[in-house]
């Protein structure tokens, strides 16, 4: 598949083995995983970091192999666990990381106003932000009146 803002193809990478159920050797139950996720979140880890810690330190390949106990038709995810326990961030993490990148790039452009390559990069990042905001408004993760404002973003990131 092609890249979003370039006319190049994507780089190939390793693929996760196709699996529909947790491995037999895995000793953790859904409750154990939920407790671990909540504990790690309270320690201040992001969802991406929680997934990495579960994989590397606890041997849990992915949380999505388990079924949600509240709704057996849905896969369990770290975000759903955090929402269930009231620990999910107000702004989704992928959007927050893009906003942080945009704020840092704006700070760079204040010091280097003629850096046109970075200016273009900022335009691309902000278009990704707008696209993601539209998606999250549609899904109900953000309020309908939420807007991305670069000045407010500085305060949001701090």
Curated annotation (Swiss-Prot):
GO molecular function: small ribosomal subunit rRNA binding; structural constituent of ribosome
Keywords, ordered alphabetically: Ribonucleoprotein, Ribosomal protein
Residues covered by region (Disordered): 1-21
Superkingdom of the source species: Archaea
Alphabetical list of CDD domains matching this protein: Ribosomal_S15p_S13e (cd00353)
Signal peptide feature range: none
Gene3D superfamilies per the UniProt record, alphabetical: 4.10.860.130, S15/NS1, RNA-binding
Claim: Disulfide bond is one of the keywords in the record: no
Any GO BP annotation: translation
The UniProt record lists the keyword Phosphoprotein: no
One Pfam family recorded for the sequence: Ribosomal_S13_N
Assembly, per entry: Part of the 30S ribosomal subunit.
Family, as annotated: Belongs to the universal ribosomal protein uS15 family.
Protein name: Small ribosomal subunit protein uS15
Organism whose genome encodes this protein: Pyrococcus abyssi (strain GE5 / Orsay)
Gene: rps15
């Amino acid at each position: 598949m092609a890249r979003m803002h370039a006319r190049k193809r994507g780089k190939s990478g390793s693929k996760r083995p196709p699996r529909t159920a947790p491995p037999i050797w895995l000793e953790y139950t859904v409750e154990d995983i939920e407790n671990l996720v909540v504990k790690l979140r309270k320690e201040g880890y992001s969802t991406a970091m929680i997934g990495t810690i579960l994989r590397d330190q606890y041997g849990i390949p992915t949380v999505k192999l388990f079924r949600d106990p509240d709704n057996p038709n849905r896969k369990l995810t770290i975000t759903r666990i955090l929402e269930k326990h009231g620990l999910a961030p107000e702004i989704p993490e992928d959007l927050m990381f893009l906003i942080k990148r945009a704020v840092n790039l704006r700070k760079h452009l204040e010091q280097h106003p003629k850096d046109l390559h970075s200016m273009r990069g900022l335009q691309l990042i902000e278009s990704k932000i707008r696209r993601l905001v539209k998606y999250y408004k549609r899904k109900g993760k953000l309020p309908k009146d939420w807007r991305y404002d670069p000045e407010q973003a500085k305060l949001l990131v701090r």
